[in-house]
């Protein structure tokens, strides 16, 4: 699958995760609604589904994994930043086929598009500190 299709999958996953975090609806319902309402023709749907399901089912573990690297409590994070960081932590911890630099860069780009003005700097700082611990030296 093309890298652009994976990037689009991440973009869609962040949007769907944001919706899920706010609505607290079942993730399968969020996925169905998202796929029926959004243009997903250039999206790696398989990867989108994996990211969405993986983050949703492991959100608590992902939060625990990132907590030591945050400068504030998870509850104080904006919903967009939380969705982006959860997605990146999922890729870092569960998708070793994705190089850690790619996971970090993609998260930074997502924060630039969807986050507040300086959220990309915050995301970069958290993931730069977290990646060596999560990947245990693997590139």
UniProtKB/Swiss-Prot annotation:
SUPFAM superfamilies: NusB-like (SSF48013)
One family name in Pfam for this protein: NusB
InterPro entries: NusB-like_sf, NusB_fam, NusB_RsmB_TIM44
A single BP term in Gene Ontology: DNA-templated transcription termination
Key words, A-Z: RNA-binding, Transcription, Transcription antitermination, Transcription regulation
GO molecular function terms listed in the Swiss-Prot or TrEMBL record: RNA binding
Disulphide bridges: none
One Gene Ontology term, aspect cellular component: cytosol
PANTHER family assigned to the protein according to its UniProt record, in alphabetical order: ANTITERMINATION NUSB DOMAIN-CONTAINING PROTEIN (PTHR11078:SF3), N UTILIZATION SUBSTANCE PROTEIN B-RELATED (PTHR11078)
Function, as annotated: Involved in transcription antitermination. Required for transcription of ribosomal RNA (rRNA) genes. Binds specifically to the boxA antiterminator sequence of the ribosomal RNA (rrn) operons.
UniProt similarity note: Belongs to the NusB family.
Protein name: Transcription antitermination protein NusB
Species of origin: Pectobacterium carotovorum subsp. carotovorum (strain PC1)
Gene transcribed to yield this protein: nusB
């Amino acid at each position: 699958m093309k890298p652009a299709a994976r990037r689009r999958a991440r973009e869609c996953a962040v949007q769907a995760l944001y919706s899920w975090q706010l609505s607290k609806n079942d993730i399968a319902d969020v996925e169905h609604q998202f796929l029926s309402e959004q243009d997903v023709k250039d999206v790696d749907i398989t990867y989108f589904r994996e990211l969405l399901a993986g983050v949703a089912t492991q959100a608590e573990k992902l939060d625990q994994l990132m907590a030591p690297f945050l400068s504030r409590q998870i509850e104080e994070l904006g919903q967009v930043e939380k969705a982006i960081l959860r997605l990146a932590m999922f890729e870092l911890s569960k998708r070793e086929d994705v190089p850690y630099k790619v996971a970090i860069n993609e998260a930074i780009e997502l924060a630039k598009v969807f986050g507040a003005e300086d959220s990309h700097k915050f995301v970069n700082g958290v993931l730069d500190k977290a990646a060596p611990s999560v990947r245990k030296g693997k590139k």
